[in-house]
């Protein structure tokens, strides 16, 4: 099966918007580093990361552990990879945890994220969780629709969207069962317990690369799905995160060769950004929205008023009046 070259792509594609921030990041930096600004930021958190055997998921697991998470749940279809990541976490955190943080509990669970029963067993075994990162993904070969393999097309949709749905559904049900959204504390402390869901989106969700008729629309679905969680679940901090252009095994196998030179971002970039989203109240104005790990977080926070007032970073049809609730009518941050 031949990969579709860019030269065959249509030329009249939608125009791109100007960059949201001027500082574009490609690797970990102090503001999102668990060794610097985010040291101990994840203390007390229990985190489940799907697709955590390699690539971005592996980096996210290590970053949360280094930031002080009390429990990391690793899951994918490959036990060997997960065991290796568990060993890495234990070695990386040994002698680097405060007495308050204690040891990081690392659980390994092999699961089929497209099987509801398997997902239910996963979340039962995981126990109480504070953060879910839906990182598992798949990428179909870049070919025109007429030449596509239906099984590859469906597999991409199943893993990227259906798997995200099943994991999020199980996470939300477990969260509600333990009182998430209800008032915590006594007396004047009316804070409500919140949890966080980070869904893996893509810059491709806002673009049209002929040949990726499932992956890119599927990531647009992830953006919209994230919005639904946001508007349905006030106590859930949810984000659709583009992890950057990372040369993962999937990208190497399925992305056209002419794109490989642009895949220069480090998986640690997305990992640090995910820790920042999950632990920083400065990120609250981004709840429900698409966000890119390439965007410098300090510049992003400086754009808060502009993003909120102009209602940016939602997925919509330009020119069509909005039928979803306006963000400021639902949650004010």
Q: In which residue ranges do the predicted regions lie?
A:
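Conserved mid-core segment of classical short-chain dehydrogenase/reductases
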Residues: 120, 124, 139-154, 173, ...
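C-terminal helical subdomain
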Residues: 11-19, 23, 240-241, 257-333
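The beta1-alpha1 cofactor-binding region of Rossmann-like NAD(H)/NADP(H)-dependent oxidoreductases
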Residues: 80, 109-121, 150
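Catalytic loop of short-chain dehydrogenase/reductase
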Residues: 176, 180-221, 226-234, 244-246, ...
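A short, exposed helix-loop element centered on a Lys and neighboring polar residues
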Residues: 168-169, 227
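Catalytic Tyr-X3-Lys loop
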Residues: 138, 146-165, 198, 222
């Amino acid at each position: 099966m031949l990969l579709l070259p860019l030269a065959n792509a249509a030329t009249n594609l939608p125009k791109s918007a100007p960059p949201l921030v001027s500082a574009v990041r490609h690797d970990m930096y102090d503001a999102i580093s668990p060794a610097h600004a985010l040291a101990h930021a994840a203390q007390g958190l229990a985190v489940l990361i799907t697709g955590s055997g390699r690539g971005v998921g592996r980096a996210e697991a290590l970053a949360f552990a280094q930031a002080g998470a009390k429990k990391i749940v690793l899951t994918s279809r490959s036990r060997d990879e997960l065991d290796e990541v568990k060993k890495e976490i234990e070695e990386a955190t040994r002698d680097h945890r405060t007495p308050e943080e204690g040891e990081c509990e690392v659980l390994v669970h092999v699961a089929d994220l497209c099987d509801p029963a398997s997902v239910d067993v996963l979340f039962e075994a995981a126990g109480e969780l504070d953060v879910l990162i839906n990182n598992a993904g798949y990428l179909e070969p870049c070919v025109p629709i007429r030449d596509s393999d239906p099984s590859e097309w469906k597999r991409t949709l199943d893993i990227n969207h259906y798997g995200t749905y099943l994991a999020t559904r199980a996470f939300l049900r477990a969260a509600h069962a333990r009182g998430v959204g209800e008032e915590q504390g006594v007396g004047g402390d009316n804070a409500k317990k919140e949890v966080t869901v980070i869904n893996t989106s893509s810059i491709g969700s806002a673009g049209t690369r002929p040949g990726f008729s499932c992956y890119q629309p599927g990531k647009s679905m992830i953006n919209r799905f994230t919005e639904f969680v946001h508007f349905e679940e006030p106590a859930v901090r949810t984000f659709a995160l583009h992890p950057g252009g990372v040369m993962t095994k999937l990208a190497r196998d399925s992305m056209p060769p002419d794109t490989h030179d642009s895949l220069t971002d480090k998986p640690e970039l997305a990992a640090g950004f995910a820790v920042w989203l999950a632990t920083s109240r400065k990120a609250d104005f981004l709840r429900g929205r698409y966000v890119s790990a390439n965007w410098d977080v300090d510049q992003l926070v400086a754009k808060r008023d502009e993003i909120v007032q102009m209602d940016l970073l939602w997925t919509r049809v330009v020119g069509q009046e909005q039928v979803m609730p306006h963000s400021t009518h639902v949650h004010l941050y």
